[in-house]
Amino acid sequence: PAGRRPPSAEPPLPHRWNLCHASQVFGQSVMQHTGSDVGLPHGKPHIPRRIEFTVHNDAPQTGEHGDCLLGELTDKGRKTMQHIGEALRARYVDAEHLLPPNLAKEDARSLYLRSTHMSRTIQSLEELVRGLVGPNAVSTPEILVRNTFDEDLLPNPRKCPKLGVLMQKFADLAVDVYNPRLAKYDDVVAPLDGGAAPRLNDGPRLSGLFDTMRSATAHGIQLPQSLENPELQTLMEHAVLDEWFGGYASRDPDERRQYRRMALGTFFESLCDTFARRATLGDADPRRMSILLGHDATLVGMTHMLDVCNHRWPAFGAGLGLELFRDRSSTEPATAQHMPGYYVRCRYGDEELRLPGCQASGKHWSGRPELCTLDAFREIVVDRLRHPQGLTIQQECTM
């Protein structure tokens, strides 16, 4: 989790989490030079890793084998991601045959894998891929990572300064709404947290405490009884959700569209282009599956864009699946502007979602409201969010 630890909590929340044994060895990444060639040494010996801690002004201390870095993927997290990969294999390889059972090098273009640049998401995707391809894969697919400035899997205020201004506006609004409500629990939280009151913006931030509490619960670490209060936990959850994501639900429809457009508009444009390429090229398009590893901000933002947000923080390992279907009885050809006979189904975990924007007649498969027409799906996440003066997202971001 994040680095927040209530210093006076009882039972105490440990500063060091010994839950990362799978990360205690590094594959050697030192390059060897052989003439004009540069490559990895044969055998690739493993180098043990231990974490060095500093506590106040004391001399640095060496942690135990298996201690975690802040925010690091734990052993349990690795197993969870492998299980997710195995579930995807059972569904899309064994049952649907989207990929061959033993992935070979010539199948590389059928599977698109991308992660944000953070080590936790890269490691998560690596574990997922191990579960997906199975033990008999002939070839290991590559994972793509973008530089921070080019990232579109989550809102990117570095690339879009105007978005950063809007994000701060809604964070400030959340402070005005929730800090007075949180004050009700000052006597509960402050004694555990070195006298710090629970606030979104003052001193130790509430989001850090909330993250630590969720991580502790997920790993079987007991919270102080006073922090187990369901009303307190719900209030904290809603406060942090509004602080981070309030702009997606702005009451001003123009501002709401602008926020969504600048936050995840580029990502959804790319996603719809991928669907359109499949619809227009058919089997000539080699890609059969894409797996993208993002963050809570990715998942919550996507559900807001689709108007299906449940206003809960995503569980660890939560995912949103978008499946493209074709009506083989449709004979009308698909074009970039109109893609008849193609449908999108959204799945949040095992739940099939009914998108509000697809419920009108003609915007879903008759009798199957969860199957949104591809045209209607694009209208929801791209067309209706376009800038009224026709500016591109890049132009709007730098205005």
Regions found by a protein language model. Name each.
Residues 1-112, 116-290, 294-399:
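Signature for phosphate-centric chemistry
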